[in-house]
Amino acid sequence: MYERAVKQGELLLIEDLTTYPCRTPIEEKLVQSGVRNMVVAPLYYQDALIGTLDLVSPHPGDLHALNTLKLREVLPLFSMAIKRSMDELNTRVQAVIKEQCTAIHPAVEWRFRHAARHWLHQRKAGVMAEIEPIVFDGIYPLYGVSDIRGSSIHRNAAIQADLVEHLRLAQAVLRIGYGTKPLPILDALAYHVGQHMAHLDTALAAGDELTILDFLHREIEPLFPHLRAFGPDVDETIQAYWATLESPMGTLYRRRKEFDDSVMLINETLSAYLDREEEKAQAMFPHYFEQHKSDGVEFGIYVGASLVERGTFDQLYLHNLRLWQLMVMCGMARQAERLKGRLQVPLEVAHLILVQHTPLAIRFRFDEKRFDIDGAYNMRYELVKKRIDKARIRGTHERLTQPGTIAMVYSQAQEGLEYQEYIAYVQAAGYLTPGIEHVELEDLEGAQGLHALRVTVEMHEAWEQQDARDDMTETVRLLVH
């Protein structure tokens, strides 16, 4: 009955429901509740179906053709009222989501809408409950990171160079001042500045930056207004000192800016590339995706039946995402390679994929406004994620991650075999050079028995990623079956 009314797009009059042929369970329930006479009217707003209006009576004939003529005239008013109610409900739901959860990934927004609606219904009924837990079970994780190699060393070197230059400028003011008016205190201060410079020549220790800047701001710079009166040479040197300090914090920010700009260029380029490719991956199959930028770009993917509103999921899409991830990591490696000529600081990028075939559960942490691994058993995955980029090959001092390569870390033999099939295809497509390194890793705290495959990205071959991806789904079918 309802299906018929919606398909026809017309008001449907049922004179006597007990004589209606082939009644569905819904219609049987209506008869049992005493409904005999009935009108079902589809409601449309801007040509889109938004609901149905039902009028019922226990007496056959109460609703007839004449009634329906009058009803047709007011149906648009009902449609507008329902649309307004739906908009108001959606506004309240979005307000709850924004307050409780901040921005939500589109792939899982449906689950948050359900939870928000349920919470609003409880509040309306006078039940002051918290929003229900949001947990997704049976989820397959994928994790990848493009890490700037030795970023801490480069950052410290930049800070060190800026501090030395800052001290040299201060020492120049003191020496010219002493040359103009030989006050022993100026010579003593110049000596202490030199001591700080000598210390920085050896290493930059924790706290050195704050100590040196405090020394300059507290003991040296307050003298400058008085020293200017010593003569034009001193005044010009002081003006040059202040002109060099570009930072609002009153520090020299030259080499550090070159480093920060280089890191930002890498991050923004890789992140933009990843966003473009992720949009294509979402079109293949919906999944949860997140990325973070620090000294490089890391991203996580969660996929599984419980993330899909209708619960339809096939392992094909999991294998497809794993292959897609490997291909995209190749693209990120090439993006990083192309940037080298534009970087003010010569930075290298290493790439890693963490493989896990065992599904896990994720829970939304309302206090932290983010998803996290749920359950103590699943925490091993998080531990490995945090420590794997520093892993070394067993029996050597060599880091697993190397510039221009992709390392795939796994713990089960079947995981390694599956990725070798992906690698063979990607090598044939021209993304990778021939050959695979099979290595065993040193034990990490909380994670033992890890292995890795390491491959080298083809940087010089002119390959087009889209050409290979056009046949990706069919390729994955062959690999799976």
PLM features: residue spans?
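Signal-transducing coiled-coil/dimerization helices and immediately adjacent hinge/linker segments
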Residues: 85-183, 192-195, 250, 275, ...
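Conserved structured core elements
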Residues: 20, 24, 37, 49, ...
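Short beta-strand-to-loop transition segments that serve as allosteric relay/switch motifs
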Residues: 52-62
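Charged, long alpha-helical assembly modules
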Residues: 145-286
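Helix-to-coil/beta transition segments that act as allosteric "coupling" elements at the rims
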Residues: 24-50
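Amphipathic alpha-helical "output/dimerization" segments
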Residues: 62-83, 87-90
